[in-house]
Amino acid sequence: MNLYIYNTLSRKKERFVPLNCKSVKMYVCGPTVYDIPHIGNARSVVVYDLLYRVLSLLYGRQNITYVRNITDIDDKIINRAKELKISIFKLTHETTIKFHEDMSYLGCCNPTIEPKATDNIDVMINIITSLIQTGNAYSTDDGHVYFAVKTFQDYNLLSRRTFDSMILNSRESSEPQKSYFADFVLWKPANADNEDIDAVFDSPWGKGRPGWHIECSAMSYKFLGENFDIHGGGADLIFPHHTNEIAQSRCAFPESRHALYWVHNGFLTVKGEKMSKSLNNFVTVRDLQKQNINGAAVRLMFLSTHYRKPLDFNDKSLNDAKNIINYLYDTIDSVNGTAQQQDNIKAEFKGNAFTVEFISALLDDLNSPKAIACLLNIAKQIRRQNQSEDKLALTQALLYASNLLGILHNYQFIKDSNDVKDNSNVTPHEIDLLIAKRIQAKQDKDWNLADQIRSQLLSNGISLTDKADGTTSWKVIK
C-alpha cells in the first residue's frame, strides 16, 4: 500500500517515500496558547491526527515520531496575560491544559513529543548565532536580530510569491533598522516596561525573546534532525511562517532539505469568511461541548470535507454529522454479540473488500469524504444482511474503519450518557474533562493526581481504559 499526499512545495500529489523506509518523522505547528482553541484551530489538529493514524497503519505507530509544538512565548500571549493581570506562565499552563482537554474530546491522539518553545531557547540562540556567522542574519543596535532574506535565493520556493507583491502587502516596511523590507525578526529585545520574567531571556544580543519563526526551526531540528519527512500546518502558515522556516533552517544547515513534504489544510469559514478571533466570528470547541454535542460528530464534520478545501461551519453540516454518528452507533448496536477485539477486527480487514476500498480512499491524499461514504456503505450492507456471521464480519469492518477515522473514541457516549445522568454525580462532559486532566497529569508525571482522578470516577461508577495511542475511553459499570 502506498500513500499519496499533496505536496505544497511541488504543487502536486506525490507518492510518499520517507527518508527511512522503516520510520517516519512529522512536525506539525501547534497552538499558540493565549486562549482556548476555536474549531478552526481544532480542524487542523484533527487533520494531522488522521494523517498520523494512516502513517501508523502503514509503518507501525512505534515507528512514527510525531512532533507538535506548543508556542508559549509570543506577543499575543504577553498582551493577553497583561489584559488578564496574570503571569505568562499561569496563562500558558492553564491554556495548554484546556487545549489538551478539547483535543481529547475530539478523539485526537497525543503526539509523540510536544515541546514548548520556552524549553528550547538555547537551541534557538545557537541557530541564530550560526546564521549571523554565515552572513544570513544581522543584529541591530537596539537588540533586534533579522534574517537577511536576499541571502537565500530560494526564499519564495514554497509560497511562489514575488517580491513586488510582498512590497504591496508588507506590514513591516516601516521598521527603519531593517536592511531590506522582507527581512524578518529572529530575536526581539525586551521592552523596558516589561516586568514579566517569563517573557525575558538572556542572549548575546541582550535580554529579549525569540521571533515566532525561529521557534519551529529550532524544535524540528532538535527532535527530528536537519531533515525530516513531513511538515504540516494550516494554509495560512505557508507565508510567512513556513516560508521563513525553510529559509532559516536551510541556511543554518546548508546540506539539508529540511522537510520533504509540506502539507497544508484549508480554512474553516463562517459565511465565506475565515474563522478567526480577530474577526470575532469564531466558535470554540467548548461552545460545542457545553451543548453536549458528541465530539465524534464534530470530528466527523471536519472530515466530511477534504482537508485541503475550505470547510464552511453551519448548523446543517453539524446536524448531518450528528445524524451519521447516530446511524453508525445504531448499526453497531443492532448486531448482537459483535466481537470488538482489535485482533479480530484487523484480521477481518485483510480480506474485506469494503475496508480495502476505505483504506484506498485515505491513501489517496486523505480523501476522508470518500472514506466516510465507504463507511456508510458498510453500515448499509450490515442492515441488509440476514446471516449473523455476515453481519458480524461487516460490523468488524465497520469498527475497524471507524476506529481509523477516530470516530469511535467515545462509542459508549450515547448509551452510557443516559446511565450517567440517572446513576452518577458527574455528567459526560465532566467525565471527558477529568479524563483530559488525568492525561495531562500523566504527562507531567503527577501519578498521584492521575490515580485520584481514576478513583474519583470509579466511585461514581465510571471505569477508565487507557489505550496504546494515548487516549482513554470510559464506560458505566453496571
Curated annotation (Swiss-Prot):
GO terms for cellular component: cytosol. Its EC number is 6.1.1.16. Pfam families: DALR_2, tRNA-synt_1e. One of its GO terms (molecular function) is cysteine-tRNA ligase activity. SUPFAM superfamilies: Anticodon-binding domain of a subclass of class I aminoacyl-tRNA synthetases (SSF47323), Nucleotidylyl transferase (SSF52374). Its main location: cytoplasm. It comes from the Bacteria. Keywords: Aminoacyl-tRNA synthetase, ATP-binding, Cytoplasm, Ligase, Metal-binding, Nucleotide-binding, Protein biosynthesis, Zinc. GO terms for biological process: cysteinyl-tRNA aminoacylation. A motif ('HIGH' region) lies at residues 31-41. It catalyses: tRNA(Cys) + L-cysteine + ATP = L-cysteinyl-tRNA(Cys) + AMP + diphosphate. PANTHER family: CYSTEINE--TRNA LIGASE, CYTOPLASMIC, CYSTEINYL-TRNA SYNTHETASE. This is Cysteine--tRNA ligase. It comes from Orientia tsutsugamushi (strain Ikeda). The gene is cysS.
